[in-house]
Amino acid sequence: MDKDLLISNIKKMKKEQNAVIVAHSYQVDEVQEIADVTGDSLALSQFCASSQADTIVFCGVHFMAESAKLLSPEKTVLLPEINAGCPMADMVTAEALKEAKKKYPHAAVVCYINSSAEVKAECDICCTSSNAEKVIRSIDKKDIIFAPDKNLGSYVAKKVPEKNIIFWEGYCITHHKIKKDAVIESKRLHPDAILLVHPECRPEIQELADFVGSTKQIIDYARNSEHDKFIIGTEMGVLYQLKKENPNKTFYMMSTGLICPNMKKTSLQSVHDALAKRQYEITLDSGIIERASGSLNRMLAVGK
């Protein structure tokens, strides 16, 4: 089926099923083009929580679709590519987190949204890269277990030094592989460019950046900045929105290897098939929904 026919069919089925298509900023361009909303994990969570649609087609990875189901359990949530997972999310399990809670019984537990529903059920509150600092500041306790991303945890620890952050040993394999030498070389090649990186990068990479922020914050920074040249230190899918909003600005990827294979699995065909076959539906145990949705709703109550 050619692209135009796929898009036409998607629009038709979406209307018939009262469905919305949400896409993370790391999705391929053609998927972002047909989405009703694009953004980072926080923006998409907020959208799903308030959506009046009956069906949410979530173009992202598994934990994101689970989060949409947790926030809107009465809705049908479809994940076009059921094997689109997240290695970082797999680096923490509910069982391991339970053991950490026994080791630090007086600590609060914050989990990055990049985690399974079962893990979210064991934590006090969730966060995203957009609101991690605000979430940490909202917690009364001094000791905080932060899972699974140690790089985001390190970033927050510097912002909120009065807290004792207990790091998990997790990381994003795409951001974590950025090396200091590559950053220095990028800055040498583009001396007039501003370096924007994601807090999932290693601390030594964050220190070299002119700005550290989530994908949405990076997009906002580039839009509002007077500068016209930027080096981008996050997954390359963000270039779609950056170039769309800033046609007269120049963006250089820090590395051509900044690709999340799981985010790239979703295609127009798989979005079409998700609607046509009503696949793949996210289902969660009612007990998990009750416990895990609380951590997400507490995050949303804290705000952006």
From Swiss-Prot:
Keywords, alphabetical: 4Fe-4S, Cytoplasm, Iron, Iron-sulfur, Metal-binding, Pyridine nucleotide biosynthesis, Transferase
One function term, GO molecular function aspect: quinolinate synthetase A activity
UniProt binding sites for [4Fe-4S] cluster: C86, C172, C260
Cofactor(s) it depends on: [4Fe-4S] cluster
Cofactor binding note: Binds 1 [4Fe-4S] cluster per subunit.
Principal location: cytoplasm
Binding site for iminosuccinate: H24, S41, Y112, I113, N114, S129, H198, P199, E200, T215
Gene Ontology BP term (one): 'de novo' NAD biosynthetic process from L-aspartate
Catalytic activity, EC: 2.5.1.72
Top-level taxonomic group: Bacteria
Subcellular location: Cytoplasm
Pathway: Cofactor biosynthesis; NAD(+) biosynthesis; quinolinate from iminoaspartate: step 1/1
UniProt cross-references to Pfam families, sorted A to Z: NadA
GO CC list: cytoplasm
Reaction(s) this enzyme catalyzes, per UniProt: iminosuccinate + dihydroxyacetone phosphate = quinolinate + phosphate + 2 H2O + H(+)
rRNA-binding in keyword set: no
Family: Belongs to the quinolinate synthase family. Type 2 subfamily.
PANTHER family cross-referenced by the UniProt entry: QUINOLINATE SYNTHASE, CHLOROPLASTIC, QUINOLINATE SYNTHETASE A
Role description: Catalyzes the condensation of iminoaspartate with dihydroxyacetone phosphate to form quinolinate.
Name listed for the protein in its UniProt record: Quinolinate synthase
Organism: Ruminiclostridium cellulolyticum (strain ATCC 35319 / DSM 5812 / JCM 6584 / H10)
Upper taxonomic lineage: Bacteria, Bacillati, Bacillota, Clostridia, Eubacteriales
